[in-house]
Regions:
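Short amphipathic, positively biased membrane-proximal segments
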Residues: 1-133
């Protein structure tokens, strides 16, 4: 018996919007994201561009019922794959906040730390779109 395609709900539309916005920014202003790429990885600019294209592809795939399941799985995988970049961003901003000691740097660092657990609800949304939850 074929499975029905999960509906395009608000959470999935939110993920689509997030991916489209972030993906476009990756392509237009890659320098914003290059510092997030873990230092052990080469060719940062190319990785930023590739992740932007992947985000846009996932977003578009989530919109269409025929591709939603595959795009949901790809979206979850992408969110897991970029998690080290989010950790790298927090680590970099922790150093900057300690070095500068100003409120703005400390607040930005706090935001990067708060962002880390927010990745899990996004992954859950992607898996729901794939019909896996």
């Amino acid at each position: 018996m074929p499975q029905t395609t999960p509906p395009l709900d608000r959470a999935t539309l939110g993920l689509v919007t997030l991916f489209l916005t972030s993906g476009a920014t990756h392509l237009v202003r890659p320098q914003v994201f290059e510092g997030m790429v873990p230092h052990v990885l080469p060719r940062r600019r190319e990785l930023v561009h590739a992740s932007g294209v992947a985000e846009i592809a996932c977003a578009l795939g989530l919109l269409h019922p025929r591709t939603r399941r595959a795009a949901g799985l790809a979206s979850a995988a992408l969110l897991v794959a970029v998690f080290p970049a989010n950790v790298q961003m927090s680590a970099s901003h922790a150093k900057r906040a300690r070095r500068r000691g100003d409120v703005g740097s400390q607040a930005f660092f706090a935001g990067t730390v708060a962002r880390l657990p927010m990745q899990w609800p996004l992954i859950r949304t992607a898996l729901r779109a794939a019909g896996r939850l």
